[in-house]
């Protein structure tokens, strides 16, 4: 019988690193300390909270991140500041409004980290190629984009409908 210091399942290096920072065994890359944290579920403002980050992941949120702070950890004192979770825009239509870059310039400073966008306007105008080009433009952006598939039907006779084979390619 062997004993393990970690969990009985295999973890990738990234997961182990994240867990070690969360447990205070290893310093994180970034620590935000002395923050007021908004709990969006209860509406409470929690005082003197700390957040520890490793790579792009939040590893710890709580009152004391001292064990996750090392000599290389960047520490931000957020006294007098309120920290909120990233916001999700659950319904937008980016295909016709403006460029992605222009939109990002306005929404990132407000705390949006994820956008769900419709693609229904694109197919009737530019077909499958237009939708695929738009989806490609959402890749490698500083925030996460999720996109819906275009509607298969249209109230416009001129626009017609989307063939099932095009929908299958998009899904």
Explain the meaning of each model-derived region.
Residues 50, 98, 166:
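Solvent-exposed, flexible loop/coil residues
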Residues 8-31, 37-84:
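Histidine-rich, glycine-flanked metal-binding segment
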Residues 2-22, 26-27, 104-171:
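Divalent-metal coordination cores built from histidine and acidic residues
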